[in-house]
């Protein structure tokens, strides 16, 4: 290759070139979808008047351009990245499930997902919603609400959900667990997660998670109240101690809770449980001094103390005094441990009772539907809004239709099967078959199976016949994809090597391994056969470059092909410079 570059840059070499050789190198590449036949190549000669004005540089530039264009045939599948026009992102729809007492749109006013996507807030209660969920189509929500005496009917596909309402309550005959299932069916992200919302539809089920934490941390770090569960009224015979608190089913805000002072009242309540056809729990009554509530919203913690003024055993009934207390490490451990249940709770609260004997008892944990109390209600709502925006920015990927800039642009393997590009030859990275020797007989000692002759070798046959197959007549279809690397590697040689004779080419090639005499017998028919010497010279030059490059990718078992390639290269140059 170094010799070829030096030889082509010599001005005296161009003067001795036969007519028709330069057009073969300068002819533009034919379309990959319709390969040119040899007759077509010979039908369109090009004038060389402009080329001889600077023979050495013109020939070298034409040859370099031909070599540069070589890998574009197999890599024609690569498409340059087109400039992406800015796409206006649609606003993300946030569905807030809460009553109408709180207008959540004002807490999300001016907030954007990832700083550039608007948030549209839709607010409704569970009773005002209906939906249809699909495997691939997501979830379509139908909303019918009444605002200021006007009925609003709207259908939309939410992107995120904030649950601020209980999905199930036996006391109010409200069961919206089917809606939670539909939202989960549609794969919608939520705060808290829909998985945890569904699990919080049963208080004994949640209490079982508290029992796990109790066994993990111990009674000193996690003082859980002693409780007994009954699936129905039949096992409810008696209680070990009185008074006891009986909780029927799943209810909120103190509903379904009864204080029983003696055995007779206990038996009466058992009959009520039988009529309710539900489960029940009993726990020892704790004479409390005050109630404790520790809430967690994201990474914000608050602790409150509530003291009954009216003297009712339920602190949420009658008059009570509420004040915020210091957040201790003990309280933080409680709420952090509870926030890990059901895959994680972004919003939760732990309720405990501080008895008059100075001991604490954890009685309940609440999720995102917890009521907000204290003087910092507005701050807590703003914290919830910030938490939702943060979760939306993490979970919702904007511009999913726009390809990522980190994705490399390259050829797609599935395009290689198209019929128009199937004639481009093997793709990059795939081994190419090596051609047999030009004009010489097959070697009998070769262990390889017989291979068919390539179209370019059919034109170089001694009989000079036309090729039978019309495929691949253009030079770029015979070149190897690795030829540009070969030309760049040879470009680093010293310029003073240009004075070496032509015979020095054989010193750069590896000696043949076997079958030398067989190939020498085919040299004479090769020199005297073809009726189109100029075309054959250009094709043999291109073919030699292709075979010399593909020999670098051969395996040790193909020494015969390497030797044939070397002989083909020598014969090509011998026929090229014979004039």
Curated annotation (Swiss-Prot):
Residue spans of biased composition, Basic and acidic residues class: 550-566
Gene Ontology biological-process annotations: neurotransmitter secretion; synapse organization; synaptic vesicle clustering; synaptic vesicle cycle
SUPFAM superfamilies found in the cross-reference section: Glutathione synthetase ATP-binding domain-like, PreATP-grasp domain
Renumbered residue ranges of the record's region E: 531-579
GO molecular function: ATP binding
Cysteine pairs bridged by disulfides in the record: none
Lipid bilayer topology: Peripheral membrane protein
Residue numbers spanned by region B: 28-90
Intracellular or extracellular location(s): Cytoplasmic vesicle, Secretory vesicle, Synaptic vesicle membrane
Protein's UniProt keywords contain Phosphoprotein: yes
Region: Disordered, residue numbers: 15-84, 400-566
Mod. after translation: Phosphorylation at Ser-9 dissociates synapsins from synaptic vesicles.
Subunit structure: Interacts with CAPON.
Protein function: May be involved in the regulation of neurotransmitter release and synaptogenesis. Binds ATP with high affinity and ADP with a lower affinity. This is consistent with a catalytic role of the C-domain in which ADP would be dissociated by cellular ATP after bound ATP was hydrolyzed.
Protein name per the record: Synapsin-3
Species of the source: Rattus norvegicus (Rat)
Source organism phylogeny: Eukaryota, Metazoa, Chordata, Craniata, Vertebrata
Gene field: Syn3
């Amino acid at each position: 290759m170094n010799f070829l570059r030096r030889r082509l840059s010599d001005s005296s070499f161009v003067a001795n070139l036969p007519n028709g050789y330069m057009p073969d190198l300068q002819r533009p590449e034919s379309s990959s979808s319709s390969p040119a036949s040899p007759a077509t190549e010979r039908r369109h000669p090009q004038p060389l008047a402009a080329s001889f004005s600077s023979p050495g540089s013109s020939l070298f530039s034409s040859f370099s351009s031909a070599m540069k264009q070589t890998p574009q045939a197999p890599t024609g599948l690569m498409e340059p990245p087109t400039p992406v026009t800015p796409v206006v992102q649609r606003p993300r729809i946030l569905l807030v499930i809460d009553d109408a007492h709180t207008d959540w749109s004002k807490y999300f006013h001016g907030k954007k997902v990832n700083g550039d996507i608007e948030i549209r807030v839709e607010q409704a209660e569970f009773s005002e919603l209906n939906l249809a969920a699909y495997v691939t189509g997501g979830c379509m929500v139908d909303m019918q609400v009444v605002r200021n005496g006007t009925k609003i009917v709207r259908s939309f596909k939410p992107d995120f959900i904030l649950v601020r309402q209980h999905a199930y309550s036996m006391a109010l005959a409200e069961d919206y667990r089917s809606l939670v299932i539909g939202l989960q069916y549609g794969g919608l992200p939520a705060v808290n997660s829909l998985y945890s919302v569904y699990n919080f539809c049963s208080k004994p089920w949640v209490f079982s998670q508290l029992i796990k934490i109790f066994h993990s941390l111990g009674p000193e770090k996690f003082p859980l109240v002693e409780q007994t569960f009954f699936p129905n009224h039949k096992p409810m015979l008696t209680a070990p101690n009185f008074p006891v608190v009986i909780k029927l089913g799943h209810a909120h805000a103190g509903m379904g809770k009864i204080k029983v002072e003696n055995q007779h009242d206990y038996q009466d309540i058992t009959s009520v449980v039988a009529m309710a056809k539900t489960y029940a729990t009993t726990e020892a009554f704790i004479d409390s001094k005050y109630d404790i509530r520790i809430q967690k919203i994201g990474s914000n913690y608050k602790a409150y103390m509530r003291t009954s003024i009216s003297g009712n055993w339920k602190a949420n009934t009658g008059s009570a005094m509420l004040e915020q207390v210091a957040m201790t490490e003990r309280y933080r451990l409680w709420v952090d441990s509870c926030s890990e249940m059901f895959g994680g709770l972004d919003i939760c609260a732990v309720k405990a009772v501080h008895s008059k004997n100075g001991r604490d008892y954890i009685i309940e944990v609440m999720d995102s539907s917890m009521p907000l109390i204290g003087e910092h209600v507005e701050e807590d709502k703003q914290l919830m809004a910030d938490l939702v925006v943060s979760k939306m920015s993490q979970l919702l990927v904007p511009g999913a239709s726009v390809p990522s800039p980190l994705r490399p642009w390259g050829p797609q393997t599935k395009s290689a099967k198209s019929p128009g590009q199937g004639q481009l030859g093997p793709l990059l990275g795939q081994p190419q078959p090596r051609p047999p020797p030009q004009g010489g007989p097959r070697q009998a000692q070769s262990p390889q199976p017989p291979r068919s002759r390539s179209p370019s070798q059919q034109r170089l046959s001694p009989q000079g016949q036309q090729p039978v197959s019309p495929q691949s007549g253009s030079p770029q279809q015979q070149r190897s994809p690795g030829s540009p690397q070969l030309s760049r590697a040879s470009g680093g040689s010293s310029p003073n090597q240009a004075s070496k004779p032509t015979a020095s080419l054989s010193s750069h090639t590896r000696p043949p391994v076997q079958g030398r005499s067989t190939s020498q017998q085919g040299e004479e028919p090769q020199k005297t056969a073809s009726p189109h010497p100029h075309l054959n010279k250009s094709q043999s030059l291109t073919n030699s470059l292709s075979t010399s490059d593909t020999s670098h990718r051969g395996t040790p078992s193909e020494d015969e092909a390497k030797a044939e390639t070397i002989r083909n290269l020598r014969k090509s140059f011998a026929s090229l410079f014979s004039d």
